[in-house]
Amino acid sequence: MADSAALLVDHILPPVDMRQWVISFPFQLRFLFANYPAVMSKVLGIFTRLISTHLIQKGGAKHSTARTGAVTFIQRFGSALNLNIHFHMLFIDGIYIDGFNKEKQVFKRVKAPTTTELNALVHKLSQRVARFLTKQGLLVEDIDNSNLTLDGLAPDPMQDLYGHSITYRVALGAQRGKKVFTLQTLAPQIEENSDSQVGSMAGFILHAGVATRGNEREKLERVCRYIARPALFEKRLAITGNGNVRYQLKTPYCDGTTDYRRSHVIFTPLDFMAKLAALVPKPRVNLTRFFGVFAPNSQYRITITQEKKPKSRMTSDKGDKWDKTVKEKRQSMTWAKRLKRVFSIDIETCEAC
């Protein structure tokens, strides 16, 4: 988490305005993405092109002369350890246009999206995803409604775990099929009107309320650490007196059946392992994607990103930095460096000296 955030801030993300876009999907699509990673990648491409077009048009430019970029983290988990595949995208909050010599890229910031624009984007996304799934033979539409057709899905023992995890139900044991037990320990909370930028339609929910300025590098790193966080936090785990697993929710929620908010979920040990198994992606599925100017093969990556290559090994004034072996370059940060980077705790310096 800390390594990924440091890599993005130090070497990839330029010192310009950035915005986090978060898109979540209906339950049926979450199940589809878990079983068909290739379909998930196609839908991610549809969403990326949609936001890119929105930014370019809002900046008053064309695709031929303007470009943008994004770093996407595909998260598979919800706050209750449920399977919830959704996308966290760090988009450049603007566009890059060609300069006078067409070699230097000039950044142009765009205004923050309004709620009306977010709702329009969600509507377009749902339509394009529906068209794509129909062409793939995965969606059958009639006059009344649309239904996913998963008849050709190859048998997989994980499908049962996926379905129960997505719908917050017990997957294994004597309580199989029942709702996961929750504790109601917090009093009702009066919800105030929020100015957060959210658009929603038919199970699609789009958030775009978190943004950073070009000079807010520490805030950007906190956002990166948040979207790169792991699924499980050990400090929220506890064992109950009867041997079950209790997991504390970061944000208590109300499911509508009672005014009291639910603060914990309870699993049997067997069902807890089933929940963790459902969060593991299929082999060779990359959960971090780079698009636009951040793509590995983009001709603009070297001129826009923070990472600069030396002209030669001899001209670098930091010779030892470029003389590192491949193994040394791939090593993670030490715990001492992580403490200093994340919590500003320098254990290598004595305060009494």
Per-range role (PLM):
Residues 1-353:
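Beta->alpha loop/short-helix hinge microenvironment recognizer with preference
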